[in-house]
Amino acid sequence: MGGLFSRWRTKLSTVEVLESIDKEIQALEEFREKNQRLQKLRVGRLILYSSVLYLFTCLIVYLWYLPDEFTARLAMTLPFFAFPLIIWSIRTVIIFFFSKRTERNNEALDDLKSQRKKILEEVMEKETYKTAKLILERFDPDSKKAKECEPPSAGGAVTARPGQEIRQRTAAQRNLSPTPASPNQGPPPQVPVSPGPPKDSSAPGGPPERTVTPALSSNVLPRHLGSPATSVPGMGLHPPGPPLARPILPRERGALDRIVEYLVGDGPQNRYALICQQCFSHNGMALKEEFEYIAFRCAYCFFLNPARKTRPQAPRLPEFSFEKRQVVEGSSSVGPLPSGSVLSSDNQFNEESLEQDVLDNNTEQTDDKIPATEQTNQVIEKASDSEEPEEKQETENEEASVIETNSTVPGADSIPDPELNGESLTAE
């Protein structure tokens, strides 16, 4: 009879079996969490109540029931030493009891999970693709986790991360592959191509994106900033863009950053944005002092933006010669020389100048009748004309002193120079 009734019983489907297993797994997981909470609660209450009871009993015994004899006191304090050990043993028993329950629960949970895994493997082998996909998405925990951790779609909005300095623009991928045309349909309409320059399509706030013809844009990939440029048919390789002229300050700043900006006088409110003149892109923020005089190259379109103003330059200082200054100071510090020293130095200078004039002017004839005093005066005048303007006054003073000495000592200048006379005769 049992076999007959067993034939009439309907067999549970795979979905129903998985649902029952899933319910049992959830019940066991809830029981495990409840068991852990109950264990912590029981152990905590045991320690709390036993501690309060222990302190209260010690206080009562010490105030009212403490005997005077030493042996009686020792016998009275023995239970107080044994009480903490008893409480500790009770706590150990409670933890052991709950741990055993947790182990049994975990074993049952592992068995149910293994059964579910076997059933899912059978589903993947026996059921159709659509049914197996639905069952796996509903009961397989691995597929659930993978679905939850799936990254957002490329078409969704991309949120900017805090502290991101350079905006990365991603071009939208366009499917430009033509649809297969039916035989009844005519050829696709020809789109006239204008001979003018191609228009630039740009996103708001970003650089213009160059449009590419359908024949060339089928293999175009979006190029991120800071990465090596990708080769595009018909277009050359572009080097990676230059860095920003000035960094872009992050929007989210902490309290410490705001305090430092307030003390230093720096921050977004004290800076000016560097906007490219060609693509109107943001290239960082410059200080007020350097905004008018800074020139930068755009990090997106490589356009060189000149400075608005030229920085004023200070006038060039005259060159300073330390040796010349020493000569001037030495000449000003030297006082009038004595008559004897002036005479000797003047005679030596006259002799040297006369010899130089004779050697340079060999073709000229010299007059023997001219006295030696006049010749020395002429040489002194020539030498004074070639000296610097600062020493003119000093030479005049020396000439006056020489004239005075000549008047007092007639024999020194009236004696003719035999060498000079001989040279003049030979020249004649």
From Swiss-Prot:
Compositionally biased residues, Pro residues: 185-198
- Please verify whether the record's keywords include Amino-acid biosynthesis: no
Query: Which gene is annotated as encoding this protein in its UniProt record?
Result: LNPK
Q: Which InterPro entries match?
A: Lnp, Lunapark_Znf
The domain of life for this entry's organism is Eukaryota
User: Domain remarks in the entry?
Assistant: The transmembrane domain 1 and 2 function as a signal-anchor and stop-transfer sequence, respectively, generating a double-spanning integral membrane protein with a N- and C-terminal cytoplasmic orientation. Transmembrane domain 1 and 2 are probably sufficient to mediate membrane translocation and topology formation in a N-myristoylation-independent manner. Transmembrane domain 2 is sufficient to block the protein secretion pathway. The two coiled-coil domains are necessary for its endoplasmic reticulum (ER) three-way tubular junction localization.
Note the zinc finger regions (C4-type) by start and end residue: 276-301
- Topology Cytoplasmic: residue spans: 2-45, 99-428
Region (Disordered) residue spans: 143-248, 361-428
Where, by residue number, does the polypeptide cross the bilayer? 46-66, 78-98
Family membership, please give it.
Belongs to the lunapark family.
Q: Which residues form a coiled coil?
A: 16-43, 102-128
Record topology, Lumenal segments: 67-77
Coarsely, its chief localization is endoplasmic reticulum
According to UniProt, the name of this protein is Endoplasmic reticulum junction formation protein lunapark
Acidic residues biased stretches: 386-401
